[in-house]
Amino acid sequence: MEELSADEIRRRRLARLAGGQTSQPTTPLTSPQRENPPGPPIAASAPGPSQSLGLNVHNMTPATSPIGASGVAHRSQSSEGVSSLSSSPSNSLETQSQSLSRSQSMDIDGVSCEKSMSQVDVDSGIENMEVDENDRREKRSLSDKEPSSGPEVSEEQALQLVCKIFRVSWKDRDRDVIFLSSLSAQFKQNPKEVFSDFKDLIGQILMEVLMMSTQTRDENPFASLTATSQPIAAAARSPDRNLLLNTGSNPGTSPMFCSVASFGASSLSSLYESSPAPTPSFWSSVPVMGPSLASPSRAASQLAVPSTPLSPHSAASGTAAGSQPSSPRYRPYTVTHPWASSGVSILSSSPSPPALASSPQAVPASSSRQRPSSTGPPLPPASPSATSRRPSSLRISPSLGASGGASNWDSYSDHFTIETCKETDMLNYLIECFDRVGIEEKKAPKMCSQPAVSQLLSNIRSQCISHTALVLQGSLTQPRSLQQPSFLVPYMLCRNLPYGFIQELVRTTHQDEEVFKQIFIPILQGLALAAKECSLDSDYFKYPLMALGELCETKFGKTHPVCNLVASLRLWLPKSLSPGCGRELQRLSYLGAFFSFSVFAEDDVKVVEKYFSGPAITLENTRVVSQSLQHYLELGRQELFKILHSILLNGETREAALSYMAAVVNANMKKAQMQTDDRLVSTDGFMLNFLWVLQQLSTKIKLETVDPTYIFHPRCRITLPNDETRVNATMEDVNDWLTELYGDQPPFSEPKFPTECFFLTLHAHHLSILPSCRRYIRRLRAIRELNRTVEDLKNNESQWKDSPLATRHREMLKRCKTQLKKLVRCKACADAGLLDESFLRRCLNFYGLLIQLLLRILDPAYPDITLPLNSDVPKVFAALPEFYVEDVAEFLFFIVQYSPQALYEPCTQDIVMFLVVMLCNQNYIRNPYLVAKLVEVMFMTNPAVQPRTQKFFEMIENHPLSTKLLVPSLMKFYTDVEHTGATSEFYDKFTIRYHISTIFKSLWQNIAHHGTFMEEFNSGKQFVRYINMLINDTTFLLDESLESLKRIHEVQEEMKNKEQWDQLPRDQQQARQSQLAQDERVSRSYLALATETVDMFHILTKQVQKPFLRPELGPRLAAMLNFNLQQLCGPKCRDLKVENPEKYGFEPKKLLDQLTDIYLQLDCARFAKAIADDQRSYSKELFEEVISKMRKAGIKSTIAIEKFKLLAEKVEEIVAKNARAEIDYSDAPDEFRDPLMDTLMTDPVRLPSGTIMDRSIILRHLLNSPTDPFNRQTLTESMLEPVPELKEQIQAWMREKQNSDH
């Protein structure tokens, strides 16, 4: 294509301007030409052939276009691909920089976690071979670029590229470049000896630029980079005649190099999402403002600006430029420049942030995507004498979390500090230069792929990084100590560094240990400080985590330099100085700050205040907010995993990481206690975050690589308390077994990582999720109690509102409501943190892994387990801590109640098998309360209790191992729980038996268990003991519940008589009301248990009768039934009439129906005799009253009533017969009397102790307790010896007595 003349270029450009176009034509020019700005045309001639490719070193001065601020970009100049100096309007620098910053920013993609997980070798260690993610990205980036084509880039073009990236010139001073006076002098003296190679030139350029900034006090060298109000005119003055400049419609920008109006209006608009006010065209004289306290929005306007009046063309162009958007990519904070004291301050009409404080303040780093708008008061003029190193700060608001919307600056306490000093501007310059290299590579991949250009760009990057290291050390200004904050932290927190910048900084400095420490220790300290000040009330909390995560992931070869540095910090694992070692570790250790973010109200009150303190918290709002908070937690925990995983991958720090993990576990052992002082242990949020990371580390572990005896290993990192309860062994048993196992063996082999990680994760569950669950349940209980108190106070208001205690009751009601509101909000936070279904599923899957390990210990043939197990309990299993089993039960109990949908996972089948195996082999567990917990889990999954777990319960009852052994095992436990060894055993047994009875009712409906039930019914001894316990429980429960109903009736009657009630003293009234409340609780509880027990009787007597008629059971059963009939229908039955009987679960008609059904189902001569022999409760009138009530209330059919009447008549006949044949045996000799009951023996037997008792009496005792009643030694029925001689003597005496009486 022919080259265009200067007149043709000028004509076309004026035509475009006249048409209102601001973009350039896309037709590339054959040689670099430059357009002129509006106004008087500037003569230009077409360059000669030698000038067509770039800048002549000897007679031309390179200059760059003001990339970024001025809105001027370069356009494609050559068909050979020299497009590094150009940009079309559709591919403006802003678009490219935004794209680059988003696609190549420091953000790690979501797959990185999974990729890093795939590198775990759990057999030999955590790392086998790993390819760095950054290396993969770089290779992928390079492979995407097109291969080099066309002629090689000349030296002139290379110089032009260098000058463009560094924005320098060494010939003419210009507003758009930094003039290098030293280089200019050298070029004038001997141009050929200025530099030996490009590396040398780059170093000279950077050093001169940076030294200029340090040596000039009243002039800022970077001020020349701030575009004027007429960027095209400025470009026209550029000494580089080969550059074609234009005013793009979407120019690339930089917050460092922007025009006054552009920065004032648009930069803050982009940074804070505020709407910029229109920028007026006034560029005349304005008052001078001091630099130190200037508003951040005017920082750029304090750079040196020519004070000469601008031409009309300039003003017009400046107005247009002022409306250009400005990117905030590399300036997370707007700072005040110390060189602006002599310049003219151009006031911006945009809203300005709050005034800068005179003392350093922490400033929150911002998200580059979403920021709330904010305005602040204008700043007063400041004295020009403010020092240049005076620190100032600016609040940068993070983007909001779940609630969205804007927020005032003062609502954020997250803040950081950045000094407004020369180092900041030097860093801005170096970061911009580094980023422009990437922009050039993206714009011109063909040219940049040429080896020479690629090497040049690599040198530029390296030199930028090297000089950044010098700046960070203070080598160019004042040396900095390790305690001073790093200038780089704010950029990292804002995610504003170019891709690869921080990695290159690590690569460049890590080989010099001192330099590396001097640069990165302040960075690490700054990130930790940022993490401490973060909260989940905004999404800013993740940025310190992301920054540290990326630092830790940076590796070179097999070394992670930052991981080495982190693990070498003095506070990596500080020694404990107080009893509160758990809280100390969280507060003082380096990683503690990063693991501490939490949604729990007791950990972070800001979360509950922001999300759950509205006037009306609806269920839907709470659900949405909870999901958002759970998403935040997931993001933060993923970053924590990257950090700890990187430290583990690094071979040099793996031991330190494992030591830290073990220290967290060991320091928080007290969290497992039922009552814990929260001040001494880590917070729930910290522990759950720690648990989540360990779960991720354990995901790929195979059980074949886990040593189940690790907890007994001499080099085990976990310290168990000496009093830790074992599954089925005492500490003496454990010590003896360990001596036997390891006493004569050679030294132990080192534990492998999979084993250590598995057990650390197991103990982390014990110390995190389960204490949190217990706290959650306690909170729910407190909410219920407060609700009940509030309801009682409201319901009884009519009784106390006119009493002297009215004021006290109102205050109590107010306090209860306030506390209730607080607890409900705390519960909402806990719902978000604890009821996260995905998190609960992870816990369940890990417990599934634990169950597999336990089942392998119980039976090596797993999964082909056969029951019953070997009678000898494996010593490994017996010696394990009891909570290994208990935690499984507790966690299942929790999710069945509060998140049953999380129950169905692939591991569910193993969980079902484990429950069945443990319940069918109760001898494997020493603690009966642990077996009771497993029973309670099965009870809770019963469809009658939790309909959503029906499938799980069906898996249990239909499991092949359960059909034969589950029913007998539960029946045995029903009787064994009579004696648990605890002081509360008498009351505990009722709840446990209630659970078993409910399970039996469900199993009875399953045809697969019918045969087992019938076998048990007919087997004799076991079932007889079971029936005896049923009789005992029914007797006690019905008696207690009916007695409590009588007391309730009595108090209610007193309170109905208001006059009599008011005459009672106040303390007596309170005592009666307190007794009423207690009786109501007791009656509700006991009636529920009694109803279940009677239901069981009703079912059993319908199926089988013979066991109930045994001599040791029949009379007791008949006496129990007669007594309860007397309670329900006797002369005092009216005492059971209470208000709202359904409130207590009292259904007298149903109870009478069931009791009379039991009579009918056991109707036979033997049972009739047992009824007649009960002289305590039976009477003819009682049975007549029962028949009358059943007829009157229609409780039974006529046929059933007639059958009951026939039974009553049969019993009455036996009573009359007994009366006629009654013989008095009260004068029997003492040797014929039973020593326990003092009645005449009919079948004497000798106990091992030598005592002689009646067989029926001792058998009845053995049903309750298998011990000798006189010395408490173990006693069974087989140990009883008949005494036939004594029996014959007793019978002879009885015959003699009968004959004498007649």
From Swiss-Prot:
Region (Disordered): 1-155, 299-406, 1057-1077
Enzyme Commission number(s): 2.3.2.27
Pathway per the UniProt entry: Protein modification; protein ubiquitination
Catalytic activity: S-ubiquitinyl-[E2 ubiquitin-conjugating enzyme]-L-cysteine + [acceptor protein]-L-lysine = [E2 ubiquitin-conjugating enzyme]-L-cysteine + N(6)-ubiquitinyl-[acceptor protein]-L-lysine
Mutation effect (D109A): Abolishes cleavage by caspase-3 and caspase-7
Record-marked site positions (Cleavage): D109, G110, D123, S124
Localization in the cell: Cytoplasm; Nucleus
Record-annotated U-box domain positions: 1227-1300
Listed result of changing D121A: Abolishes cleavage by caspase-6. No effect on cleavage by granzyme B
Residues modified to N-acetylmethionine: M1
GO terms for biological process, alphabetical: ERAD pathway; granzyme-mediated apoptotic signaling pathway; neuron projection development; proteasome-mediated ubiquitin-dependent protein catabolic process; protein autoubiquitination; protein monoubiquitination; protein polyubiquitination; response to UV
Phosphoprotein in keyword set: yes
GO MF assignments: ATP binding; enzyme binding; ubiquitin-ubiquitin ligase activity
GO cellular component, one term: cytoplasm
Tissue-level expression: Expressed in differentiated myotubes (at protein level). Highest expression in ovary, testis, heart and skeletal muscle. Expression is low in colon, thymus and peripheral blood leukocytes. Almost undetectable in lung and spleen.
Biased composition regions of type Low complexity, renumbered to the chain: 16-33, 76-99, 340-374, 384-400, 1066-1077
The entry's keywords: Acetylation, Cytoplasm, Nucleus, Phosphoprotein, Transferase, Ubl conjugation pathway
Compositionally biased region (Basic and acidic residues): 134-147
Domain comment quoted from the record: The U-box domain is required for the ubiquitin protein ligase activity.
Keyword Cytoplasm: yes
Annotated protein name in UniProt: Ubiquitin conjugation factor E4 B
Changes after translation: Proteolytically cleaved by caspases during apoptosis. Cleaved efficiently at Asp-123 by caspase-6 and granzyme B. Cleaved with approximately 10-fold less efficiency at Asp-109 by caspase-3 and caspase-7.
Domain of life: Eukaryota
Protein role: Ubiquitin-protein ligase that probably functions as an E3 ligase in conjunction with specific E1 and E2 ligases. May also function as an E4 ligase mediating the assembly of polyubiquitin chains on substrates ubiquitinated by another E3 ubiquitin ligase. May regulate myosin assembly in striated muscles together with STUB1 and VCP/p97 by targeting myosin chaperone UNC45B for proteasomal degradation.
Sites bearing Phosphoserine, chain numbering: S23, S31, S84, S88, S90, S101, S103, S105, S124, S238, S383, S803, S969, S1265
